[in-house]
C-alpha cells in the first residue's frame, strides 16, 4: 500500500513538473497582456470617462453665481414734470450692487445629452486605440513564440545530422583500423562534425535570446528546458479582416464624428431655465429711492444664440473632411494588411516546404550511407568514395 501511494504521488509530481515546463501560445499572450505596463491604461480610460460623464450630468444641478458692481452714470431716472411744493428725491449717479443668482436649467437644447454621447464616443476611440497597441504586443509575442518553434525544429534536424555524422565517423574509424581508409578521410568527417556543432551553438544562442525576450514580455521565468506547445491551426494568428482591432478603431472614430455632427445641431437650439436673484444695493428696485435696499427677483429665462450659424457650414465641412481622412486611413490599412497576409502565407508555405525537404534530405542521406556501407563491405566502393559520398554539404 505504501509503495502504491509513493508511486501515485510521484506520478502526480512528475505530471505537475511537466505541465509547468510546457507553455502554450494563448498563455504567453495572456501573460504578456497582464504584464505589459500599458494595460493600466484601460482602468485610467474608464475612470476618465466616469469623471467626464459625472461632470456633464451636473449641468442639471442648480448653478450659483455671485456678482457685484459699482458704477457711475451720466444721468439718472427723473420725473418729466415738476410738482410745486413737492421735493421728489432721485437716485444718485453712483450706484452699487451685490447680487446672488441661482439658475436651474429646464431644457438646454440637448447639450448635456450630446456632451455625454461625445464623452462616450471619445472614450471608445481611446479604448480601441489601446486594443490596437495591445494587438501589436500580441503580434510581437507571436513572432517570438513561432520563432522558437522554428528553432526547435532546426535543432532537431541538427541533432539528426550530428547522429548521422557520428555514425559516419565511427564507420570511417573502423575502415582506418582495417587499412582501407586514411586519417584525412576521418579529418574530413571531423570538420563536418565541428561545423554542425558550431551551427547548433548559433541556433541555441538565438533560442536563448528569443526565450529571454519572451520571458520579459510574459513576466515568467523560462528556462532552456521550457517546451513550447505547437498551437492548433485555429490558434494561429487570426488574419480575418473583420477581427482586426484597427478596423474597430476606425469605426469608433467614425462614431465620434457622428456625435460631433449631432452636437452642432444642439448649438442652434434655445435654452430655457428658471432663475432667482437676491441683491443688495443702491438703488434697489425703486429707482427713485436713493438708499441701500435688499430685493429679489424670480422668473423664467429663455436664451437663443444664433452666433453658431456663422461657422455651422464650415464646421460640417471640417467633419466631412475628417471622415474622408479616416476612410482613406482604413483603405490604406486594408491594402497593407492584405499584402502582409499574402507575404506571411508565402513565408509559412516556404518554411514548411524547406523543413519537409530537410527531413527528406536526412532520410535520403541515411539511405545513401547504408547503401555505401554495404558497397564498401562488398568491395565495390572504396573508403575514400564512401567518405565523400556520405559527407553532407552544410
Can you say where each PLM-predicted feature lies in the sequence?
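Periplasmic alpha-helical coiled-coil/stalk elements that build and connect Gram-negative outer-membrane
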Residues: 23, 27, 51, 133-248, ...
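Small/polar (Gly/Ser/Thr/Ala-rich) solvent-exposed segments
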Residues: 40, 63-82, 92, 103-132, ...
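Bacterial Sec-pathway N-terminal export signals of envelope proteins
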Residues: 21-65, 180-182, 215-260, 269, ...
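Membrane-embedded beta-strand positions in outer-membrane beta-barrel channels/transporters
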Residues: 99-101, 145, 297-301, 345
